[in-house]
């Protein structure tokens, strides 16, 4: 059954999801978005679209209109789904981070998971936690490209079958906690310091990378932080970059080394709670 916190209506795409994935879905709390939340959305989108029109892959701007993403207001799931169904996809709201294997399985079923939260003003150019700007304005536009959406589905299909290790689960919980603390304005410096130390310790003691860890790395450096085209003059297509004006400007600087995307990328770890690249 869907999460009892909210009663949700499943559509033709999400009805095909395995029932054990329903527990991650929540009803988008649209009425809880404040005027400040809406202002944050408008500000980030206006800055991003104006900048990205010259440095992003062509499919980004085309996808903004195809998927019903407005610069003026936070999108509603119902509106997005009416448009996404035409390209065989759907969107669901989730509560922040979900486990990597669940994320991959949603993707394998052509379902885009969208965190219902929105970043605070403090993190307006970059957020350490998943939010609706990252998911809706970063991921959704690019999946309107047929070739890319099929790539994403296949990636999810393979990733959902990858084997995780106990260390992967520990890392997921540690990163989830750290991202929540960093985004919460009421968090103490001591709690953030302690959570950061926990993540750093785990990162240094992961041992041999599991299948899931390698898939997660591959996913991160393409779907989230991928560049495409000439390595000396690339275009942006990764959702993490498309939804972060700070990171999208940083990544194109000549001082940032651009690396070819190869199978070796599966060995390159990352810290989700820090701006990329770092």
Positions of PLM-derived features:
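Short linear loop/turn motifs
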Residues: 98-101, 235-239
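Short, hydrophobic/amphipathic alpha-helical patches that form generic packing surfaces
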Residues: 79-86, 153, 157, 213-228, ...
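C-terminal structured domains
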Residues: 2-24, 239-278
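Extended, Lys/Arg-enriched charged tracts that mediate electrostatic binding to polyanionic substrates
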Residues: 168, 172-180, 184-229, 238
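Extended alpha-helical surfaces
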Residues: 88, 109-116, 128-143, 203, ...
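Glycine-rich, compositionally biased intrinsically disordered regions
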Residues: 75, 172, 189-191, 226, ...
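Extended, regular secondary-structure scaffolds
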Residues: 212, 230-231, 236, 250-251, ...
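The feature captures two recurrent sequence modes
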Residues: 1-191
């Amino acid at each position: 059954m869907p999460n009892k916190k909210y009663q949700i209506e499943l559509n033709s795409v999400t009805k095909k999801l395995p029932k054990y994935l329903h527990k991650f879905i929540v009803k988008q709390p649209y009425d809880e978005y404040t005027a400040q939340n809406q202002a944050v959305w408008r500000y980030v989108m206006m800055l991003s679209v104006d900048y990205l029109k010259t440095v992003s892959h062509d499919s980004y701007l085309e996808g903004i209109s195809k998927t019903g993403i407005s610069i003026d207001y936070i999108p509603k799931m119902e509106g997005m789904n009416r448009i996404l169904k035409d390209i065989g996809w759907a969107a669901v709201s989730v509560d922040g981070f979900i486990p990597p294997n669940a994320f991959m399985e949603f993707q394998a079923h052509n379902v885009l998971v969208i965190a219902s939260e929105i970043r605070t003003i403090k993190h307006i150019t970059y957020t350490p936690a998943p939010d609706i700007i990252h998911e809706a304005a970063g991921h959704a536009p690019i999946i309107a490209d047929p070739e890319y959406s099929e790539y994403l589905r296949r990636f999810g299909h393979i990733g959902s079958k990858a084997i995780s290790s106990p260390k992967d689960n520990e890392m997921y919980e540690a990163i989830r906690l750290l991202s929540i603390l960093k985004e919460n304005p009421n968090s103490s410096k001591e709690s953030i310091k302690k959570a950061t130390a926990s993540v750093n310790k785990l990162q240094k003691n992961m041992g041999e990378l599991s299948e899931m860890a390698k898939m997660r790395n591959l996913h991160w450096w393409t779907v989230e932080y991928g560049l495409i085209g000439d390595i000396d003059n690339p275009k942006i297509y990764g959702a993490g970059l498309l939804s972060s004006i700070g990171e999208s400007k940083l990544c194109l600087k000549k001082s940032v080394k651009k690396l070819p995307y190869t199978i070796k990328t599966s060995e390159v770890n990352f810290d989700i709670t820090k701006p990329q690249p770092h």
